[in-house]
Amino acid sequence: MSRKILVTSALPYANGAIHLGHLVEYIQTDIWVRFQKMSGNECWYVCADDTHGTPIMLRAEKEGITPEQLIARVHGEHSRDFAGFHVGFDNYYSTHSDETRDCANDIYLKLRAAGLIETRTIEQYYDPVKQLFLPDRFIKGECPKCGAKDQYGDNCESCGAAYAPTDLKEPYSAISGAKPELRTSEHYFFKLSDPRCEAFLRQYTSRDNGVLQNEAANKMQEWLGAPGENKLTDWDISRDAPYFGFEIPDAPGKYFYVWLDAPIGYMGSFKNLCARNGLDFNEYFKPDAKTELYHFIGKDILYFHALFWPAELAHAGFRTPTKIFAHGFLTVDGAKMSKSRGTFITAESFLKTGLNPEWLRYYYAAKLSATMEDIDLSLDDFVARVNSDLVGKYVNIASRSAGFITKRFNGQLAPATAELPAIKGIQEAASRIAELYEAREFGKAMREIMALTDAANQYVDSVKPWELAKQEGKEVELHAACTNALNLFRLLTVLLKPILPIVAEKVEKFLNIAPLHWADTQSLLAGGHAINAYEHLMTRVDPKLIEKLVEANKESLAPAPEAQSQQRHAEHQQNEVTAESPWEPFCNIDDFMKVDLRIVRIANAEHVEGADKLVRLTLDVGNNETRNVFAGIKAAYDPAQLIGRLTVMVANLAPRKMKFGLSEGMVLAASDGEGKTPGIFLLSPDSGAQPGMRVK
């Protein structure tokens, strides 16, 4: 029975070019979608540009154009690049659309009606020149820990320290250079910490539920905490004007944070497709839908897609994703993509250099699995593998046999030898390879297909049509040998069609056949079938083209300030390598042991009146002793939810007199210095730890 499937890829941010890191996901998704369609399933593939946010607004202003003009131009560039790599979206849309706005408003109003939206007053830095509130990455100053200048508002790239923007010394706006002012503003929060959300997410993200890969499910349980320990924090879903995005209903001057409406862009894009194609939107998004919904994403945006997004959908009365498939990042020659080395390669430059996009599609397929492991693009291996597998093995079968059919047999085939072991081998393996495609184990599928290709070539080598053609009286044998070779080639083309759609089209034209489907692996071309003249299908990779590509992508390592501020976006690209190491210099064990790390229990936690970031913690450090500590975690944790929790503190840090009192230590928390994963995460020891125990 045919399945009804809706598939999405993450939305690329409309503030930069598509590069080879992005293409891992879109090629992976496209292969899976093409396989589903070949298998007879009704499968729709939608995506869109992620178009909202402060960086879009500022870049448009810098270019002297409107945000609408900027996103329209970038949409054209992205569409061109995806088409160049044969990514076959059924709809590639924009989040800046009426459909997405309507869906965002609908979800928000339903969450509000369910009591899952609340307002809070927060304190933020404000740029008096640009007259806007500044995101953390748009504030710079001196690091409060090491004194390094020109550091961002959330972490120091010199010493790695994480802090609140208000901790910066001599802060200034990265946009105007002005000294920012602290101002209060009312913000809107989605109550992810609500017991209803927690209970739903514990079940939804569990390994037993099967929505996530095991490693992703394990990560979700870390973020949720142990049963009875709700580590979820409420999510700030609003931003203040001026902001390029959708205004929140009944809240003039307040806008949805871009990450609120970005995944809703999946719905908006599909709604647009439904209107054009006469599809039923509700059939795919009603809570009891029998259809299937799959999201392909990078592992760095799991937090949004596996926690916020399904919680929003479930409590707004929509279905949740059937499965969420997360993949790893791309490295090039074993390292992060780097502009200085020329390995931060854009899709446009790859195509302009003259490289065949199907070479990359095949190489990625050969490396991809169903896990979240990173994959490496080794440029030397890329050349060797494509030349060996695609040209030397696969295409070689047709090039060694087709010409004889055209020249000697008027383009007509003989009856195929159905019991030929190489033919039977492909037909018997087809269902197994289909299972690998379904499971996204593309690398395993490619290995099986290449083994079958080797067997096909062994058959051609054994019958030697080029020698039969020289011998008188061998016409029947030659005709049969070339017919069998072309039938083998056709069967292999079916198996490779999700990877090589353009080559498959050329093969269909050359063999004079209808578009191939997966079921065609079980049939052969009939005797007397007429084929067309063979035309060359694929050339070898010239290593000089790779050298040209690398040179074309080399540029200064110094990123533009605007590019540095894009850390939070939905685009799951790897950031280029910087000259600084992300690790601290080595210390010896004696230096480490000078830091007295202790397990503590949070005996009490309360807001600090007049402080926008601080929570006052009373810590039980064991031996009936308590310490008073101020922690900059207000944006991440409700103080009431911290009481009773175990964490880790630096017990021998010199007391520090603050405006609000004396701080007698420091609790430890983690944050993503690159901004890919938002939030602050208080450290927790394993079960069994007791206050006063030393960490060593």
UniProtKB/Swiss-Prot annotation:
Residues annotated as binding ATP: 339
Motif 'HIGH' region, residue range(s) on this chain: 12-22
Keyword Secreted included in the entry's annotation: no
Record has tRNA-binding as a keyword: yes
GO biological process: methionyl-tRNA aminoacylation
Protein name (Swiss-Prot/TrEMBL): Methionine--tRNA ligase
Residues of the tRNA-binding domain: 591-696
NCBIfam families linked: metG, metG_C_term, PRK00133.1
The protein's required cofactors: Zn(2+)
